[in-house]
């Protein structure tokens, strides 16, 4: 580089530095507004170009993956509602499916609106297999149309897949009830689709809606009715993941303690194949919110729907979103859908179905207080069982009248229980007493006792109903909250359970006044009520209140019956019968021989002979 070039470059550098230095120190006379006006369009154009490029790329990707369904992958979400006196069903053009279901006449434990179905905690998909990628029909966008069919409301969602091919979802809701009819149709596809069933996958993160979240968690499961094996359900309290693969199923139901969401084929059809799953307690579904306070369990039902029915337009299904009410579920046109309401074992279920529920519903139609209804129910049951109670009391009174003879036997034989029992049987025979006559009436009352044990925990009518300090008769009454947890008892005090325990102890004391039971067995009868105090502390307040009232009525009944039974006169009658039997007097016919007593005598004689034989061997 020569001398002139060096000088030229140096001058240019000095001039440029001076220019930039001067410009940077100048204050503009007016605010600079030009740059935003110039640069904004540039930024907007950039964004638009990027957006257009993204849309183009997305459309191209959708076209490659979904073919004719690509156009339906984009759209605008719009809501439609189906409403009757019981439910509000919200539908969306995004997916052409159910967005939420509100039960109008029920509320959560904290008095909020009860949404039995919400998209936030329900993952619902309907997979259609195509020659390209499987398509989730509930991810497409549809056009919605509202219409009427008599007193029924109808919403139809339809999307165009090109070349005359359409997918159509139709939802119908009657003027009342909790059932939503659902029709699915795929038209114009001809033989383009592979002959594979559609898969409806329903995953629910069960939300807490009951006060007692532990009982609600235990009672949440998947119920189903199979054509061959009948009704069954996944283990409710299992700590492991429970899964069953089923065939020919009438319906599946994601059941909670007092409500259920079900799916079934209309007109008596069956689901060819289904897989149901109950996830462990406190578990969550994939992509579901994790909140142990809000969500209590995770359930899933995956059903296979024949493609042929969808293509032919004969795919007629239905959803049920409602209470576990026996009468309501019985009216659902699905095979034995009332099985979602647990009424107990066969005999107990029969009593609840044909006796308890009709009587309870009848009382409910007359009285508004459920406390009063329970009291009247107790009185009616005790009135029906009065003959059995009277017979049981008289039998115990007879046994007590023989106490002098029985005491003599104990003094005579000491600790030789076998000898005592043998002679006791002879005494009973002489006096014409069947020692089991007092037990049989009690045993006959057991089915009713068990019926109540199954009825009250599952009676949705008691849900949210208050009585005195109990705010919800379907849950335990928390009279006091303990600052600690007692093993097998809990951290709360149920006053109705405490009253039930005290009344049971009182009844036991009254009953022991006419009982011949002595020794450890007598004191054991006082231990059982204490056990029930622990067992029933977390059971529904309605059940504990029923047992409490039942005990009070039974005590009063015992005291009244005692006034009409003259124990002295009863003793004279027994002695007369003994004298008659010992004299061989058969006037009026020989006494009937009790087969059971005869068998007991024979068994005791055989046992005595065996023991005598063993003693003889030892002596040798």
UniProtKB/Swiss-Prot annotation:
Transmembrane segments: 5-25, 343-363, 366-386, 436-456, 482-502, 529-549
Protein family per UniProt: Belongs to the OXA1/ALB3/YidC family. Type 1 subfamily.
InterPro entries: Membr_insert_YidC, Membr_insert_YidC_N, YidC/ALB3/OXA1/COX18, YidC/Oxa/ALB_C, YidC_ALB_C, YidC_periplasmic_sf
Statement: the UniProt record of this protein carries the keyword Transport: yes
UniProtKB keywords: Cell inner membrane, Cell membrane, Chaperone, Membrane, Protein transport, Transmembrane, Transmembrane helix, Transport
Gene3D superfamilies (alphabetical): 2.70.98.90
Any Gene Ontology CC annotation: plasma membrane
Gene Ontology biological-process entries: protein insertion into membrane; protein transport
Subcellular localization: Cell inner membrane
Function: Required for the insertion and/or proper folding and/or complex formation of integral membrane proteins into the membrane. Involved in integration of membrane proteins that insert both dependently and independently of the Sec translocase complex, as well as at least some lipoproteins. Aids folding of multispanning membrane proteins.
Quaternary context: Interacts with the Sec translocase complex via SecD. Specifically interacts with transmembrane segments of nascent integral membrane proteins during membrane integration.
Entry membrane topology: Multi-pass membrane protein
This protein's name: Membrane protein insertase YidC
Molecular function via GO: membrane insertase activity
